[in-house]
Amino acid sequence: MAKDTTGRLRVTVKTGGKRKLSSKLWLERQLNDPYVAQAKRDGWRSRAAYKLIEMDDKYHFLKPGLAVVDLGAAPGGWSQVAARRVGAVDGKGKVVAIDLLEMPEIVGVTFARLDFLDADAPEKLIAMMEGGADIVLSDMAANTTGHRKTDQLRIIGLVESAAAFAADVLRPGGTFIAKVFQSGADADLLVQLKRDFRTVRHVKPASSRQDSSERYVMATGFRGTPAV
């Protein structure tokens, strides 16, 4: 074991057998990530839970009694946080979640295995919600091709679809948060969000890996109807 720049012991993984270099690097990153270890100790499904916790601690949008939609929920870190903070675990608030992958049950969360981009997915989600939403969360990420420009366009297209859904289901004053990547390709998205919401900002939580271009667009104060 070696020490990293903070003085912590760093775990290294040997490449052997059928393990690819990319798998080795991913495993090393997981083993040396303090948020991964902390998530296990705190009972969160993933390190992503801390990103939502940080954002809510600062901006206070997850309030008791609110209804939340979590798009791209698996393995469930964000759904866990949302369910606790809006009181869904006690039947006060509501959390509805979907993902392409199966997700083990979480107390207070209604889950369906759905592809958000399927034509009938929004209708199914609305039926699950049994009413409007106060918050739409999206930690979805498109499959990457390795071609940077193509990947940027894919993720922006996914976020634009999530934003359009949010505009259909959010109650006035609602909040929309989605994962994006710093690229400059989201100019049109920001224009639309600024029409529909009173405040739009980019947020990069401390728990988001610093070597990643990942950040979140946070739109608050939904106007109720798009501004003309």
Swiss-Prot record:
GO terms for cellular component: cytoplasm. It catalyses: uridine(2552) in 23S rRNA + S-adenosyl-L-methionine = 2'-O-methyluridine(2552) in 23S rRNA + S-adenosyl-L-homocysteine + H(+). Belongs to the class I-like SAM-binding methyltransferase superfamily. RNA methyltransferase RlmE family. Its EC number is 2.1.1.166. GO terms for molecular function: rRNA (uridine-2'-O-)-methyltransferase activity. This is Ribosomal RNA large subunit methyltransferase E. Coiled coil: none annotated. SUPFAM superfamilies: S-adenosyl-L-methionine-dependent methyltransferases. The active site is at 179 (proton acceptor). Pfam families: FtsJ (PF01728). It is found in: Cytoplasm. S-adenosyl-L-methionine binds at residues 76, 78, 99, 115, 139. The keyword Kinase does not apply. Keywords: Cytoplasm, Methyltransferase, rRNA processing, S-adenosyl-L-methionine, Transferase. InterPro entries: RNA_methyltr_RlmE, RNA_MeTrfase_FtsJ_dom, rRNA-MeTfrase_E, SAM-dependent_MTases_sf. Specifically methylates the uridine in position 2552 of 23S rRNA at the 2'-O position of the ribose in the fully assembled 50S ribosomal subunit. It is an enzyme of class 2 (transferase).
